[in-house]
């Protein structure tokens, strides 16, 4: 073959393959010094330059269909020599071929003759697959999750709450909100009634009333109507969130209303005590007057009897006077 000038593409590919296979065999001999590849020599180096062995064809196919990251083999320079078999061609290999072989050594080793390394990698991969996907792996994953859940519970003391308890919480919130609304309504009603009672008209007389009797009957419809409207207007889920929001928002208002309610209750109790004392005083006056009336009635009865006696005496005296006049008239004759 010519030593310089333009060379055909077939000879260039053949020389590159021969150099690549020689280097591969050398690397395989370094990895497995006792293997059959080191003692058998290089069968591809003995083949003629014009003919391609099956292994060479496989190598070319693997090189052409290699990974995307591997660099394409560069053609040697026109002045490069075109013959050299064996290990002597390794130093003269093109830099492009070295780069390609360095970037994909694993693909070259796997595509060659079936060696001991490929045989060892297959059971290893099978073992790894068996470890990753099997009942033991699922069991280990479940144990890890249980351990994490235990650690969470241990650190915080919080247990997962089922949905039923959440619904119970919402219902409790609704009940508490209804009670607060009812108390607020009763408080407002009591304040209105007490203000109306403490400011009577000057021309009218003051009559004490019991607020416990008058309040429920008068304001029963007003307290029950908003609850019915809320229950009809909002579903259960909306009412739960609405009640919780209102409870958080009306917390200071409820505290102030409770304090005012307590003060109002104390004032009402004092007022009730005063009214009871006044009532007792009036009852005593009425009893005294009734006693006086009874005594006066007895005196009137006595006077009526005396009057009757005096009328009888007067009639008797009139009769006596008539008789005396008759006697005197007879005597004068």
UniProtKB/Swiss-Prot annotation:
Cited InterPro entries: Par-4
Additional comment: The synapses are crucial cellular sites for the cell death promoting actions of PAWR in motor neurons. Targeted inhibition of PAWR by RNAi is neuroprotective.
Role: Pro-apoptotic protein capable of selectively inducing apoptosis in cancer cells, sensitizing the cells to diverse apoptotic stimuli and causing regression of tumors in animal models. Induces apoptosis in certain cancer cells by activation of the Fas prodeath pathway and coparallel inhibition of NF-kappa-B transcriptional activity. Inhibits the transcriptional activation and augments the transcriptional repression mediated by WT1. Down-regulates the anti-apoptotic protein BCL2 via its interaction with WT1. Also seems to be a transcriptional repressor by itself.
GO-annotated cellular components: actin cytoskeleton; chromatin; cytoplasm; cytosol; nucleus; plasma membrane
Post-translational modification note: Preferentially phosphorylated at the Thr-156 by PKC in cancer cells.
Organism per entry: Mus musculus (Mouse)
Basic and acidic residues bias (residue ranges): 175-185, 235-248
Biased composition (Low complexity): 1-14, 33-51, 66-80, 105-116
Region span, Leucine-zipper: 293-333
Protein name, per record: PRKC apoptosis WT1 regulator protein
Motif, Nuclear localization signal: chain positions: 138-154
GO molecular function, one term: leucine zipper domain binding
Coiled-coil zones: 255-333
Assigned keywords, A-Z: Apoptosis, Coiled coil, Cytoplasm, Nucleus, Phosphoprotein, Transcription, Transcription regulation
Localization terms from the record: Cytoplasm; Nucleus
Residue ranges of the motif B30.2/SPRY domain-binding motif: 62-66
Domain remark from Swiss-Prot or TrEMBL: The leucine-zipper domain is not essential for apoptosis, but is required for sensitization of cells to exogenous apoptotic insults and for interaction with its partners. The SAC domain is a death-inducing domain selective for apoptosis induction in cancer cells. This domain is essential for nuclear entry, Fas activation, inhibition of NF-kappa-B activity and induction of apoptosis in cancer cells.
Keyword Nucleus: yes
Biased composition regions of type Polar residues, renumbered to the chain: 186-196
